[in-house]
């Protein structure tokens, strides 16, 4: 757990920060364990942008490093993309005070973006691709075995809907990803963390936040619309966002329509198979078993009991015809 200084906080604020810190550390620890993100001897390149998410990620990883049963190294890396007005002194001062190893890189991707993207258009996509390429190359240069990025649960869900709505794909951000060339392993330790928790934590910790819109680019309108949609769902339908994320971890290719993920053409029936009932497992109305007291998760025990009951019911033949 992070070391919390409570001198400047009221007792209520200190209690809230302690609870929030425990939750975030627990969620990061669980994500790391679930996806085996960090292993003995790893050198983790922690990408620090100056935003709330990457600050929180670095802070939590450093705290977990002190108590972890394995040994791993953390190196913070920031890429100065030469955006006008970028406060170059903030991150070095913060990292010096923290006592963590770090590198500040400089590469003028801003000029490239301004040259390629028409005035008034969102530059975020090209900017992030250029940044990613530079960071991937530097990770190999310093011998980093993992690249840690600060994407959280909201980012993952937003990306899922963006791809569904605008690209026709069921695709999100995996908590752990091997780069296309196989040279870099990307991890997202905040994958289980809610953005609103991270924002509150960052405010308590008083991280020296650097705004991401120094370039003058506006937020991607599509992502903004999806973010607003999810906020409304979270407000009016508690548990829905949690249920969506749970569903992303419980996919059933055989119950979908993607022929690349499941061999539908190869399906064959077994005429000698014992009868299990007149309701297929996939036809169970899962929504009948929503456990509203458990963040909207499905009550699997209730669903199975209902399935077993249906299987035991006798089928009465009330009419038949044979020509």
From Swiss-Prot:
One GO MF term attached to the UniProt entry: sulfurtransferase activity
GO cellular component annotations of the record: cytoplasm
Chief localization: cytoplasm
Residue positions of motif PP-loop motif: 49-54
Record-listed E.C. numbers: 2.8.1.-
Pathway assigned in UniProt: tRNA modification
Pfam families listed in its UniProt record: ATP_bind_3
Reaction(s) the record says it catalyses: cytidine(32) in tRNA + S-sulfanyl-L-cysteinyl-[cysteine desulfurase] + AH2 + ATP = 2-thiocytidine(32) in tRNA + L-cysteinyl-[cysteine desulfurase] + A + AMP + diphosphate + H(+)
Keywords, ordered alphabetically: 4Fe-4S, ATP-binding, Cytoplasm, Iron, Iron-sulfur, Magnesium, Metal-binding, Nucleotide-binding, RNA-binding, Transferase, tRNA processing, tRNA-binding
Gene3D superfamilies (UniProt xref): HUPs (3.40.50.620)
Residues annotated for [4Fe-4S] cluster binding in this entry: 124, 127, 215
Note on cofactor: Binds 1 [4Fe-4S] cluster per subunit. The cluster is chelated by three Cys residues, the fourth Fe has a free coordination site that may bind a sulfur atom transferred from the persulfide of IscS.
Cofactor list: Mg(2+); [4Fe-4S] cluster
Biological-process GO terms, alphabetical: tRNA thio-modification
InterPro entries: Rossmann-like_a/b/a_fold, TilS/TtcA_N, tRNA_Cyd_32_2_STrfase
Subcellular location: Cytoplasm
PANTHER family named in the record: AMINOTRAN_5 DOMAIN-CONTAINING PROTEIN, SULFURTRANSFERASE-RELATED
Note: The thiolation reaction likely consists of two steps: a first activation step by ATP to form an adenylated intermediate of the target base of tRNA, and a second nucleophilic substitution step of the sulfur (S) atom supplied by the hydrosulfide attached to the Fe-S cluster.
Function: Catalyzes the ATP-dependent 2-thiolation of cytidine in position 32 of tRNA, to form 2-thiocytidine (s(2)C32). The sulfur atoms are provided by the cysteine/cysteine desulfurase (IscS) system.
Description of how the protein assembles with itself and partners: Homodimer.
Family: Belongs to the TtcA family.
Name of the protein: tRNA-cytidine(32) 2-sulfurtransferase
Organism expressing this protein natively: Shewanella denitrificans (strain OS217 / ATCC BAA-1090 / DSM 15013)
């Amino acid at each position: 757990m992070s070391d919390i200084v409570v001198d400047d906080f009221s007792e209520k604020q200190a209690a809230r920060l302690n609870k929030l810190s425990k939750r975030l550390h627990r969620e990061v620890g669980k994500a790391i364990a679930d996806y085996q993100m960090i292993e003995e001897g790893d050198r983790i390149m922690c990408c620090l942008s100056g935003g709330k998410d990457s600050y929180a990620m670095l802070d939590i990883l450093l705290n977990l490093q002190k108590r972890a049963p394995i040994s791993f190294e953390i190196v913070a890396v920031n890429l100065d993309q030469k955006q006008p007005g970028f406060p170059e002194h903030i991150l070095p001062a913060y990292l010096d005070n923290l006592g963590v190893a770090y590198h500040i890189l400089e590469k003028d991707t801003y000029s490239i973006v301004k040259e390629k993207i028409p005035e008034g258009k969102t530059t975020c996509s090209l900017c992030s691709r250029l940044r990613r390429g530079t960071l991937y190359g530097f990770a190999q240069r310093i011998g980093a075995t993992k690249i840690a990025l600060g994407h959280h649960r909201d980012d993952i869900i937003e990306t899922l809907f963006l791809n569904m709505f605008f690209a026709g794909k069921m695709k999100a951000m995996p908590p752990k990803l091997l780069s296309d060339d196989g040279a870099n392993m990307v991890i997202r330790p905040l994958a289980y963390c809610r953005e609103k928790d991270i924002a509150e934590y960052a405010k308590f910790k008083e991280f020296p936040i650097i705004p991401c819109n120094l370039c003058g680019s506006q937020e991607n309108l599509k992502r903004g619309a999806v973010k607003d949609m999810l906020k409304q769902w979270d407000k009016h339908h508690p548990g829905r966002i949690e249920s969506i994320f749970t569903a992303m971890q419980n996919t059933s290719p055989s119950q979908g329509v993607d022929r690349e993920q499941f061999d539908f053409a190869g399906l064959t029936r077994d005429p000698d198979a014992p009868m299990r009932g007149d309701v297929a497992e996939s036809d169970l109305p899962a929504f009948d078993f929503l456990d509203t007291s458990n963040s909207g998760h499905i009550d699997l025990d209730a669903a199975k009991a209902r399935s077993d009951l249906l299987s035991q019911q006798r089928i009465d033949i009330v009419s038949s015809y044979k020509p």
